[in-house]
């Protein structure tokens, strides 16, 4: 039985009962919906052995091939599988620990990710370190057998539902930019951490501010060495690109299918201009799929290929345009808000952020020109005094 057939059978048997209400839920723009139920689903998923399929067998995985993992992600999305509460742990933290962590760290952290009982969030962005991420100001100092952390993180997805956070902090006084950084693993349930949800115009609150006031992490909870924080942080982001993006594209396909269904029901499908835009959206989605498949032939150590640099700006712009298409298909009713936003209204509002988070389109263009094409770096302004 193929992995697709295996998962298909399991989803038919288990995405039922109380879990039926979170089918198609919990994806981008809807990540704060039914947190307790999605956490229960994550644990059920883990108990069935579906988490960490690509991991080596010695760490509880199945050494699943890349193409099998592609099929797995596509099949999960095809069933309307709920947005995974543990996706940050499985797709970002676990590969980083496997690639750069010690054996003790693997033994400590991988089981909680594998069984779905420990959820992770990402502590990168700060009020003055967003697109310019190397401007990190959060401080960490080693005191005895603990790191002591002071500072603030912002736009931290699902921090209020998580158990752990991985944090980039500055550990060497007097350093700037990418130098002197550490990559720490910090438990969230402690007196020195204050988590404040950010309520958005879309009505959701999946993002948070996280304040550290002499928060502590065990001395051994550092990935790599002092000064290697930037290298580890960038490698982690590289793990985002690959097979899991094909599952994301299946979710995009579901959104496009809903747009087409709506257009057929309200008669907007007869508009030649909208039909052309729907066709262009379909073509763009196919381009994304083929590019993602091509990226699978690249390295799996977190490094980024030229295609990887291009991928983010392409899908972010495509998804933003899809949100605008959704509003035009709804027509005048798009401006009417009932008790709860419709799925297509949520798509429009959330997709506006796609071109900002994880690197703005402007930053991505600089990266493509400088790193992928080898063009001269953009002149940077200087500060006098």
Language model regions located:
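Amphipathic, small/basic residue-rich leader segments at the start of a protein or domain
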Residues: 1-87, 107-115, 258, 265-266, ...
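A short core secondary-structure module
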Residues: 145-146, 150-196
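A short, Trp-centered hydrophobic/proline-enriched beta-strand micro-motif
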Residues: 116-124, 168
């Amino acid at each position: 039985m193929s992995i697709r057939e295996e998962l298909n059978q399991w989803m038919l048997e288990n995405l039922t009962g109380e879990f039926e209400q979170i089918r198609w839920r919990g994806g981008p723009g809807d990540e704060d919906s039914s947190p307790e139920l999605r956490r229960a689903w994550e644990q059920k998923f883990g108990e069935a052995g579906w988490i960490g399929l690509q991991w080596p067998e010695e760490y509880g995985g199945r050494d699943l091939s890349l193409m099998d993992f592609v099929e797995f992600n596509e099949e999960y999305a095809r069933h309307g599988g709920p947005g995974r509460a543990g996706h940050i742990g499985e797709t970002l933290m676990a590969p980083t620990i496997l690639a750069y962590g010690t054996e003790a760290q693997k033994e400590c952290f991988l089981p909680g990710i594998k069984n779905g009982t420990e959820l992770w969030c990402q502590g990168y962005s700060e009020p003055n370190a967003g697109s310019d991420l190397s401007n990190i100001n959060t401080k960490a100092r080693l005191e005895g057998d603990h790191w002591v952390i002071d500072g603030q993180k912002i736009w931290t997805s699902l921090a209020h539902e998580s158990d752990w956070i991985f944090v980039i902090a500055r550990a060497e006084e007097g350093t700037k930019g990418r130098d002197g950084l550490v990559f720490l693993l910090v438990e969230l349930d402690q007196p020195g951490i204050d988590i404040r949800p950010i309520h958005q115009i879309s009505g959701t609150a999946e993002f948070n501010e996280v304040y550290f006031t002499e928060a502590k992490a065990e001395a051994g909870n550092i990935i790599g060495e002092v000064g290697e924080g930037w290298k580890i942080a960038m490698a982690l982001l590289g793990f985002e690109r690959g097979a899991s993006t094909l599952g994301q594209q299946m979710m995009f396909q579901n959104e496009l299918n809903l747009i087409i269904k709506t257009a057929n029901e309200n008669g907007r499908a007869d508009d030649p201009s909208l039909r052309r835009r729907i066709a262009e959206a379909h073509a763009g989605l196919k381009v994304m799929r083929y590019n993602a498949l091509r990226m699978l032939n690249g390295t799996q150590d977190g490094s980024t290929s030229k295609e990887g640099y291009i991928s983010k700006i392409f899908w972010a712009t495509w998804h933003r345009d899809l949100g605008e298409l959704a509003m035009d298909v709804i027509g005048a009713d798009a401006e009417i808000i009932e008790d709860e936003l419709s799925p297509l209204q949520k798509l429009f509002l959330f997709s506006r952020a796609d071109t900002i988070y994880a690197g703005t389109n402007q930053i991505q263009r600089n990266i493509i020109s400088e790193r992928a094409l080898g063009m001269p770096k953009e002149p940077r302004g200087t500060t006098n005094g």
